[in-house]
Amino acid sequence: MTGRVAIVTGGTGALGQSVTSRFLSAGATVWIPYVVPAEVEALKARVGAGASLHCAHADVTDETAFGRFVQSVLDAHGRVDILINGVGGFAGGDLVSTRLVEWDRMLTLNLRSAVIGCRGVLPAMTAAGFGRIVNISSRAVVPPLGGFIGYTVAKAAIITLTQALAREVARGVSVNAVLPSTMDTPANRQAMPDADRSGWVSTDAVAEVIGYLASDAAGMVSGATIPV
């Protein structure tokens, strides 16, 4: 991954920090769009603030804002090699009790952000003849679980997006998805203090799978949906 240029959306979150650390350690340059400055400081406290890490304010659910962000990356490096669509959100609720505004929020955070991300980088990747896109779905959608239907539907759509887009992209560009089970994060520990965490997966373990899919070695893997 030495010399590769990566965009990691959601890079200030728990999984995003692990992915960013993994990529920086492998020699990549990482660009992260953010909206909360304090989260950037937390990221830098973990991975450092070296010359290979770039953070710029951009809302990835706003196509115009993300387009400007991508152009900044292209202006600096001339290419975007890797996109990790790591932005997402969770909310519980069944079909009847989930308000439409919450449906919209789940679709915006989990699906719209990924669509905008892919649309933003694909022209440059296609022109270069190289690209790695990794989307984040969830094991909760295979098979779909009830009780948090807005989240489930949005993450299931990520699988369809991944598989369909893998058939649309040019040679040299791959599109894959990882499906984490419950991740061991501070937020999940707080939300489920009495849960059995023996089956939870670490964010570093998920980042290792993402790292492989983003690597040059994974060029023949596309359209895969990998549970972790």
Residue ranges and their predicted role:
Residues 94-95, 102-107:
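Substrate-binding pocket helix/loop in short-chain dehydrogenase/reductase
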Residues 118, 154:
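Active-site helix of classical SDR
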